[in-house]
Regions:
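Sec-dependent bacterial lipoprotein signal peptides
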Residues: 1-19
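Beta-propeller-forming repeat regions
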Residues: 21-356, 362-365, 386-402, 406-408, ...
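A short acidic-to-branched-hydrophobic micro-motif
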Residues: 369-386
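A short acidic/glycine-rich loop-to-helix N-cap element
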Residues: 413-424
C-alpha cells in the first residue's frame, strides 16, 4: 500500500475482477469478467498457463481474490497476479501476466514453499515507481508461516527479505513516505511474550531492527491497527488478551531513528479490562486523526445495595506522544450490549452514575460533595414491533433510527440546569461501529 488514499480507478478495477462469473465449478468462481476483448485475451492466457494447477486465493487480509491487479514495475500499466497451487516440492505459484501488443502474456512465475497463501499486501517499500509484493504463506497445517517481500523495480521479481511470522502489517513508522514491514513472531521460548521486528529499505537492502518485546504472546493478539500518535507520528497499535479478561495494547513506533514499544518505555499503563464482556480497543474515538487508547473508570453506585456485577464504567480516552507521555482527550459511556455510546464532559466524569433497567439507562449526576444525586435523563433502546411509537411516546425524542432498533431519550427537569438539551444529546450520541475484519465492536 501507499500511505495515502488509493486511486479510485484502481479500487473500481479491483472490485470488478471477480464480477460477472457464472455458476459452475469452484475454479469458475475465480474467473475474470467477460467484459472486453482485453479481458478475453487475459482469460485465454490464464487458461493456457493453468495446466495442472488450481486457484489458491489468500486466506486472510483485505486482498482475498485469486486474481489481483497492481502496477508492480511502475510503468503505469497494471500487472495481473494469479495465486495458484500445484503438486510438487514448491506447490505455491504466483503467475504474473503483463499486457502485450497482442493481449496478455505470462511473464513470470514465482514458485515457493507452503500449503496455502495466508495474506497478501502491496506497498511502495523501495521508493521506486511501482509496488512491492508482500506474501504471507502457511508452511504447514500448524501455525508456522513465512512472509516474503518481492520487488519488481527492474522488471522481474527480486526477493528482498523473508522471515517467519504470526502476524504482519505494513506501515510508514519513520515518516519517509515509503512502506515498511512490521512482523510479529514468537519469542525464543513458547511461554515467552512475542517479539516485533521492523524491516525498512536502506541502501538497496531490507534492514532488520533488533527484536522488541511485546506484552503478551503472539497467539493472544486480537487486533492490529495502524494509526497516529498525538505528535503526528505513525504508530502500530497491537491489542492482545491477558489473563482472559483484559486487553493490553502495545504501541510501536520509530523514535529518534530507533524502533521501540512506547508502552514498555513510557508512562502508559496500557491494560484495560472488559466492559460487560466486550473488549475495548484503541480507536480514533473523536475523529481527529489521532488514535486514542481506553482506560476504564468505575462509576459510583447509586446505592450501597448494588452488587459489583451491576457496576457501570466510563472510558477515559487518551493519546500517546512519541516520548510515551499521555494527552487526555475525552470521556465516553459505551453500552456495548445495545450498540451505542455517548460523549461525557470531563468535569462530570467523577460525579456520574448510570443505572440499567432492562434496555433503558438512567443517567444521574452527583452534587459537588457527593451527598445527593439528580436524574438528568434516560436513554432507551426499543426493538419491538411498536418501537417507532415507543420512541416518541410522552416526552421522549428520537436519538437514532436503525433498521431494527429505535434509540430514544427523555430529559428530566434537572437537565436544564446543567445545560443538557435535546440537540446536545443528539450530537453526543453515537453508534458503536463493528470492525468489518473481525466482526467485533
Amino acid at each position: 500500500m501507499r500511505f495515502g488514499r488509493k486511486p479510485a480507478a484502481l479500487l473500481l478495477l479491483l472490485s470488478m475482477l471477480l464480477a460477472g462469473c457464472t455458476s459452475g465449478s469452484v475454479d469458475r468462481l475465480y474467473c475474470l469478467p467477460k467484459r472486453s476483448e482485453a479481458h478475453r485475451d487475459l482469460q485465454l492466457a490464464i487458461d493456457a498457463a493453468m495446466g495442472g494447477m488450481e486457484y489458491s486465493a489468500p486466506r486472510s487480509g483485505e486482498n482475498l481474490q485469486a486474481v489481483q491487479v497492481r502496477d508492480l514495475d511502475g510503468d503505469g500499466k497494471g500487472e495481473y497476479l494469479l495465486f495458484a497451487k500445484k503438486a510438487g516440492d514448491r506447490p505455491l505459484q504466483i503467475l504474473i501476466f503483463r499486457p502485450t501488443a497482442d493481449g496478455y502474456a505470462l511473464s513470470e512465475t514465482i514458485e515457493t514453499y507452503g500449503t496455502a497463501f495466508d495474506r497478501v499486501e502491496y506497498a511502495n517499500i523501495d521508493g521506486k515507481p511501482g509496488y512491492e509484493l508482500i506474501v504471507g504463506r502457511r508452511l504447514s497445517d500448524q501455525v508456522i508461516r513465512a512472509v516474503s517481500v518481492y520487488s519488481f523495480a527492474e522488471g522481474q521479481s527480486a526477493l528482498l527479505t523473508t522471515d517467519n511470522y504470526t502476524h504482519f502489517t505494513t506501515c510508514d513508522l519513520d515518516g519517509d513516505g515509503n512502506g515498511e514491514l512490521l512482523v510479529f513472531k514468537h519469542g525464543e521460548a513458547a511461554e515467552q511474550t512475542g517479539v516485533a521486528v521492523y524491516y525498512s529499505y536502506r541502501d538497496g537492502i531490507m534492514e532488520r531492527s533488533a527484536e522488541v518485546s511485546m506484552s503478551a504472546p503472539t497467539e493472544n493478539v486480537k487486533r492490529i491497527l495502524v494509526g497516529w500518535l498525538a505528535d503526528n507520528r505513525m504508530a502500530v497499535f497491537v491489542a492482545s488478551t491477558v489473563e482472559e479478561n483484559a486487553i493490553v495494547t502495545d504501541v510501536f513506533s520509530v523514535v529518534d531513528g530507533k524502533f521501540t514499544n512506547l508502552t514498555l518505555s513510557g508512562e502508559a499503563g496500557n491494560g484495560v479490562g472488559m466492559v460487560r464482556n466486550y473488549y475495548v480497543y484503541a480507536d480514533d474515538i473523536d475523529n481527529d486523526g489521532v488514535t486514542e487508547l481506553p482506560e476504564l473508570i468505575s462509576m459510583r453506585p447509586l446505592s450501597e445495595s448494588e452488587s459489583p456485577g451491576d457496576s457501570q464504567y466510563l472510558i477515559r480516552w487518551y493519546a500517546l506522544r512519541s516520548d510515551g507521555t499521555r494527552e487526555q482527550k475525552l470521556y465516553t459511556y459505551h453500552n456495548y450490549e445495545s450498540g451505542w455510546y455517548i460523549s461525557i464532559q470531563s468535569d462530570w466524569a467523577q460525579r456520574l452514575t448510570i443505572v440499567q433497567d432492562g434496555t433503558s439507562y438512567g443517567v444521574y449526576l452527583w452534587n459537588a460533595d457527593n451527598t445527593e444525586s439528580e436524574k438528568l435523563l434516560t436513554v432507551y433502546a426499543f426493538s419491538g414491533q411498536d418501537r417507532e411509537t415507543q420512541a416518541v411516546s410522552g416526552n421522549r425524542f428520537l436519538l437514532y433510527e436503525g433498521d431494527t432498533v429505535q434509540y430514544a431519550a427523555e430529559l428530566e427537569v434537572a437537565a436544564v440546569r446543567y445545560g443538557v438539551t435535546k440537540d446536545r444529546l443528539i450530537r453526543n450520541f453515537h453508534l458503536i461501529q463493528q470492525d468489518w475484519k473481525t466482526g467485533e465492536t
